[in-house]
């Protein structure tokens, strides 16, 4: 009830709010589920009651886990390794249900390792690019988790924004999931090489994917969206 007035007269809702880190979710699963599942249900219900046209929901590539091999497609099985990915994929199901049952148009995005301006730069669980940049700036060793051979599909925040805007203009794909990535993977150790500097290995962490790379065919086809920012070009800037 508290959030319903905020949805009055709104056409599009971009739902990005979440408890959004894997390791803190492992430490406090109840909080992660309550915030991410309950919060998403609140957003969808308020949108339905106030006549919102469409909800864009931000989910995670962590849904693919370890059982699926890149490139990762939206029709692959879910393999949730931690409470965070469980809570976010539950939100995906809620979005589909609100589309099927109530006719609320929803679009779900699975983001692949978003980076860019205003990214968190400190803390044990800050995204790796921001963390490495801050460590290097401070003259510290960059902390590589495990052997560093794990790969990620790093996606610039501007491309994420463009995907959300594109979703306000599409005419199909409601209740469905769309990967938002670049379709290219880079290892953490190669990222260190791009940044330059000394590093140290730290122990592996539980509940994290090994390799990620998005198949973005569906977003290209239905949303008419393409990634424009490459990691190499952004680092040069």
At which residue positions do the language-model features occur?
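Conserved Rossmann-fold NAD(P)-dependent oxidoreductase catalytic core, especially the SDR/UDP-sugar
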Residues: 15, 34, 41-83
């Amino acid at each position: 009830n508290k959030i319903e007035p905020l949805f009055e007269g709104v056409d599009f809702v971009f739902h990005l709010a979440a408890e959004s880190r894997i390791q803190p979710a492992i430490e406090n699963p109840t909080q992660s589920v309550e915030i991410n599942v309950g919060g998403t249900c609140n957003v969808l219900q308020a949108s339905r009651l106030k006549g919102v046209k469409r909800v864009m929901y931000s989910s995670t590539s962590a849904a693919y886990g370890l059982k699926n091999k890149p490139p990762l497609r939206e029709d692959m099985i879910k393999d949730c390794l931690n409470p965070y990915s469980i809570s976010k994929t539950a939100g995906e199901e809620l979005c589909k249900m609100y589309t099927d049952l109530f006719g609320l148009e929803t679009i779900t995005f699975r983001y692949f390792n978003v980076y860019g301006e205003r990214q968190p730069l400190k803390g044990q669980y800050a995204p790796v690019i921001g963390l490495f940049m801050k460590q290097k700036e401070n003259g510290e060793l960059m902390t590589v988790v495990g052997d560093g051979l794990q790969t990620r599909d790093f996606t610039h925040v501007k491309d994420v924004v463009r995907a959300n805007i594109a979703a306000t203009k599409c005419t199909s794909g409601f209740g469905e999931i769309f990967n938002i990535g670049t379709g290219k993977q880079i290892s953490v150790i190669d990222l260190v090489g791009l940044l330059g500097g000394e590093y140290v290995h730290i122990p592996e962490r539980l509940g994290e994917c090994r390799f990620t790379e998005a198949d973005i065919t569906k977003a290209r086809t239905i949303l008419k969206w393409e990634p424009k920012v490459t990691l190499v070009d952004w680092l040069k800037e």
